[in-house]
Amino acid sequence: MIRFITIPDFADYQVILKLMEDYVNKVISDHEPEIIYLVEHSEVYTAGTNYKQEELLNYGDIPVIYTGRGGKFTFHGPGQRVIYPILNLDSPNRHKDLKLYIKMLEEWIINSLNYFGIKAYIIKDKVGIWVKVRKDEFAKIAAIGVRVRKWVTYHGVAINISTDLSKFSGIIPCGLEDSLVTSLNQLGIHVEMSEFDKIIQTEFNKIFK
């Protein structure tokens, strides 16, 4: 059984990044067990390896951190559950297939949202998890950005629970102009983070056996 570790309070992004990187090295060199960090960050914009500087619009006093994960700009902050799985895809019960791993992440989050009555989708050529908010119009509810070192995964998924969505106006989220963002709260689903975490853990064990 993989251990989920909940980081208390609002965590500094750079502190968690170092925590992840250190643990990835331990998995690679010392064969430490797989774990998953559950984090709620203090406000920060992060840029993935495919970012364009013009996609950073007006960040004000929110720090901007350039990371090694895939993807472009996104926002992390209170009310958002960020999930960092550190999994060894080279272990006997896994597959050395990054596309399959991302597909499994998507299925995991979609199933978790479905528990709360939210029908979520993946959209061709658009990274992340989406929900229909109006006819033929979708909003992103979860962002995905991962990295792999010697087949050990890190970075992960950010799901908007009760996030202040106005903060996304400081960037072009994931490089998608005119794309909408949403949250469970905005969809009328009010859930405590601890309750959401229980479902995340249950659904994880169904997908990542």
From Swiss-Prot:
According to its UniProt record, the EC number is 2.3.1.181
Q: Which GO terms describe its molecular function?
A: lipoyl(octanoyl) transferase activity
Q: Name one GO biological process term.
A: protein modification process
Q: In which pathway does it act?
A: Protein modification; protein lipoylation via endogenous pathway; protein N(6)-(lipoyl)lysine from octanoyl-[acyl-carrier-protein]: step 1/2
What residues make up the catalytic site? C174
Which CDD domains did the record assign? LipB
Positions of substrate binding? R69, G70, G71, K72, F73, T74, F75, H76, A143, I144, G145, G156, V157, A158
Cited Gene3D superfamilies: Bira Bifunctional Protein, Domain 2
Q: What cellular component GO annotations does this protein have?
A: cytoplasm
Keyword presence, Acyltransferase: yes
Keywords from the UniProt entry: Acyltransferase, Cytoplasm, Transferase
Give its localization.
Cytoplasm
Which coarse location class describes where this protein primarily resides? cytoplasm
Task: List the catalysed reactions.
Answer: octanoyl-[ACP] + L-lysyl-[protein] = N(6)-octanoyl-L-lysyl-[protein] + holo-[ACP] + H(+)
Question: What role is this protein assigned?
Answer: Catalyzes the transfer of endogenously produced octanoic acid from octanoyl-acyl-carrier-protein onto the lipoyl domains of lipoate-dependent enzymes. Lipoyl-ACP can also act as a substrate although octanoyl-ACP is likely to be the physiological substrate.
Task: State the family named in the UniProt similarity comment for this chain.
Answer: Belongs to the LipB family.
Fill in the misc note.
Answer: In the reaction, the free carboxyl group of octanoic acid is attached via an amide linkage to the epsilon-amino group of a specific lysine residue of lipoyl domains of lipoate-dependent enzymes.
Name by which UniProt lists this protein: Octanoyltransferase
